[in-house]
Amino acid sequence: MLVCIPEVLSKDEVAEFRRIMDAAEWEDGRATAGAQSALVKRNEQLPPDGEVARQLGARVVRALLANPHFVSAAIPLQIFPPLFNRYGEGHHFGMHVDNAVRGDPLTGLRIRTDLSVTLFLAEPDEYDGGELVAEDYYGTQEVKLPAGDLVLYPSSSLHRVTPVTRGTRVASFFWLQSMVRSPQARSLIYDLDGAIQGLAAELGQDHAEVVRLAGIYHNLIRTWAEV
């Protein structure tokens, strides 16, 4: 399941992020890549242990947890501290799959990577190329979103970033461990939640059928959640 979520950050927040990031020091993006990924990764990133990445990352996490669409789709248990990258002309990231487990040396956090996230911080017309191409159960999907929007997709997906041929692609990227390990179960819960919200808008939150379906939703999470 690949899910696009709009306006996680406002345009003003994106502009502020970009001002701060433009003034920071960047390093080779291969510093955080696994052995296989490092062979196909060509970009730059903010040092993960630097103050800029940590402060901006904390703001991203707060925005995520305040976004009902994100929480519904991800059912997050642990969110890895967000990282930040940029792709200039000629930069790309070849086909790869993300590491199954990620560890943060600063906090000691270790997570199973159930979902990968890209939060776009550059408008599509700022650069050519730079599309995220992901292969999942539904085939190959190509994503290039407005600044402030994010895409959420299974970390088990083969994916790549196409070469940037003009301008600069800027983004935050990170992983999360969901309370619900199974992507199929998570997709069912997400679809059910969407149906409940639609019925609640039409019938009211206190309608008997809405209440009954909400109970089914919570019981499914109770059945599948690992906390």
Curated annotation (Swiss-Prot):
Q: Which residues bind 2-oxoglutarate?
A: 169
Going by the record, the broad EC class of this enzyme is oxidoreductase
The protein's Enzyme Commission number: 1.14.11.-
| Keyword match Metal-binding | yes
Keyword Nucleus assigned to the entry: answer is no
Q: Which GO terms describe its molecular function?
A: 2-oxoglutarate-dependent dioxygenase activity; iron ion binding; L-ascorbic acid binding
The record, for SUPFAM superfamilies, names:
Clavaminate synthase-like
Question: What is the required cofactor set for this protein?
Answer: Fe(2+); L-ascorbate
What keywords sit in the KW lines? Dioxygenase, Iron, Metal-binding, Oxidoreductase, Vitamin C
> In the record's cofactor note, how is the cofactor described as bound?
Binds 1 Fe(2+) ion per subunit.
Q: Which InterPro entries has this protein been placed in?
A: Oxoglu/Fe-dep_dioxygenase_dom, PKHD_C, PKHD_hydroxylase, Pro_4_hyd_alph, Pro_4_hyd_alph_FE2OG_OXY
Q: One biological-process term from Gene Ontology?
A: intracellular iron ion homeostasis
Q: Which residues bind Fe cation?
A: 96, 98, 159
Domain Fe2OG dioxygenase residues, every copy: 78-178
Check the record and name the NCBIfam families matching this protein: PRK05467.1-2, PRK05467.1-3, PRK05467.1-4
| Name recorded for this polypeptide | PKHD-type hydroxylase M446_1130
